[in-house]
């Protein structure tokens, strides 16, 4: 499947927006695309992002060979809406997903939404996904879009929001650490039963097998969505041994704790969390090494990122005990709109076609990948819908990116103890958080106050007025989205309980 690419790209601006197109020689095949998504990986969880203990050599190497972003934002601070935004390029609320999706609920990606896979399939790509989907309420919901409907020809899907072993009799018997052989995966809608390995290796092995069995010369899109480092943590002994000094004596004596017992047990130490990151990194390495062995490294765009911020040591629920995500000093965590909940690692590599070893401080969003890839891979975006991102090709060409719209984020968390932070908007160095009543509650200059400690509400009236007006305009556009109206969706809060 060896392909070539025209290194000299000619970019033409097409209209007042940021849409650009790349002119290719007629006989040049398109590049491959691999998107690798980690689950709940924090901004400070990788050595490439400053972690002093965790070893992530494969992701570090990816950063050295590509572009690493310091101000990259996941589309949302929760799994389901973030994944919806990443794959569609649309603010998650537009897609019908405002929060994480519990099993059995009537929530799923809107049927009139189009993913990157849908669009690349139209261009003749082979498409496959391996890992966590979480864009519907389960594999049994035939009334809801499944991975096949989202454009994936081949599918190894974890049908829930996390992995578990349902062969055990009750939740109390299901191990949280050490040995979780998942039962929730399906291959092309057929249940696999209980796996004989942990989730990460199950996913990476499937990727390698799919590539080995791919016989045609078509370009491919692989969406690899690891369940690591979402709880339950499950890592082979060799990775636990790497961080033995950071695992408590009690944890070493009791490698399996059970769901009903955690709250009355001693702290297990951070080592199990560190081990799970290194285990995930090794699986990333397997995928990247395979692409290199195939001779496709120079012709493959690789994107690595996380769906949202981490669960930190400040556990809110019993199932969060003993997690140890790091934000590198950013305020907040998964499920809120502080920087720690939405600013995450992100790296893009594309051989010699984009800079190598570059670090960009330009604020970008997971919603930017769709228009960026449309330009890089020479496919058109539908004109019947609003896209919230814009191409970041200027950044990859070492030019300044002129943002046409601010970055906007939303959260609708029905189980949140204090659900006050529903919206956030970033424009340049300024970020505003708006509460559920629509009141501007916080304003920060992130260039001067990265940790969000100095609230400027009432102190910067002109900035406050300008950004709040931008928010109202943007929110109105989202609430009146044409695809939402076509589905009959209403911009109302999530109320399940």
Model features per residue range: what roles?
Residues 1-9, 19:
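Bacterial N-terminal signal peptides that target proteins for export
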Residues 10-13, 22-442, 446-476, 482-483, ...:
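Formylglycine-dependent sulfatase
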């Amino acid at each position: 499947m060896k392909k070539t690419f025209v290194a000299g790209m000619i970019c033409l601006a097409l209209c007042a927006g940021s849409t650009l197109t790349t002119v290719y020689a007629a006989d040049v095949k398109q590049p491959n695309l691999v998107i690798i998504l980690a689950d709940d990986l924090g901004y400070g969880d990788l050595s490439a992002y400053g972690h002093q203990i965790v070893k992530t050599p494969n992701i570090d190497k990816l950063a050295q060979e590509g572009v690493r972003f310091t101000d990259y934002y996941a589309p949302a601070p929760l799994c389901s809406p973030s994944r919806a935004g990443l794959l569609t390029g649309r603010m998650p609320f537009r897609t019908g997903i405002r929060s994480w999706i519990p099993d059995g609920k009537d929530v799923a990606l809107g049927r009139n939404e189009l993913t990157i896979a849908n669009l690349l399939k139209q261009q003749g790509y082979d498409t496959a996904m391996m890992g966590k989907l979480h864009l519907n309420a389960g594999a049994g919901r035939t009334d809801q879009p499944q991975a096949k409907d989202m454009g994936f020809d081949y599918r190894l899907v974890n049908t829930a929001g996390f992995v578990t072993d349902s062969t055990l009799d009750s939740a109390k018997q299901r191990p949280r650490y050490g040995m979780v052989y998942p039962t929730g995966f399906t291959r092309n809608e057929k249940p696999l039963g209980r796996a004989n390995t942990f989730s990460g290796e199950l996913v990476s092995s499937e990727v390698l097998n799919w590539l080995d069995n791919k016989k045609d010369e078509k370009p491919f899109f692989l969406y690899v969505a690891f369940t690591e480092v979402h709880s339950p943590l499950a890592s082979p002994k060799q990775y636990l041994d790497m961080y033995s000094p950071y695992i408590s004596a009690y944890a070493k004596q009791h490698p399996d704790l059970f769901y009903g017992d955690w709250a009355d047990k001693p702290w297990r130490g951070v080592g199990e969390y560190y081990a799970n990151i290194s285990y995930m990194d090794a699986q990333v390495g397997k995928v990247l090494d395979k692409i290199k062995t195939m001779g496709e490294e120079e012709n493959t765009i690789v994107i690595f990122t996380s769906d949202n911020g981490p669960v930190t040591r400040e556990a809110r629920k019993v199932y969060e005990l003993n997690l140890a995500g790091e934000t590198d000093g950013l305020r907040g965590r998964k499920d809120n709109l502080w920087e720690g909940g939405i600013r995450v690692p992100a790296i893009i590599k594309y051989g010699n076609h984009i800079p190598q070893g570059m670090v960009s401080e330009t604020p970008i969003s997971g919603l930017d990948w769709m228009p960026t890839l449309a330009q890089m891979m020479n496919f058109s975006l539908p004109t019947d819908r609003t896209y919230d991102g814009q191409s970041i090709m200027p950044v990859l060409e070492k030019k300044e990116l002129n943002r046409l719209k601010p970055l906007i984020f939303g959260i609708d968390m029905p189980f949140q103890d204090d659900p006050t932070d529903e919206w956030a908007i970033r424009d340049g160095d300024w970020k505003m958080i708006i509460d559920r009543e629509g009141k501007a509650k916080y304003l920060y200059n992130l260039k001067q106050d990265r940790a969000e400690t100095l609230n400027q509400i009432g102190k910067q009236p002109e900035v406050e007025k300008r950004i709040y007006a931008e928010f109202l305009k943007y929110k109105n556009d989202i609430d009146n989205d044409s695809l939402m109206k076509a589905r009959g969706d209403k911009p109302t809060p999530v109320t399940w309980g």
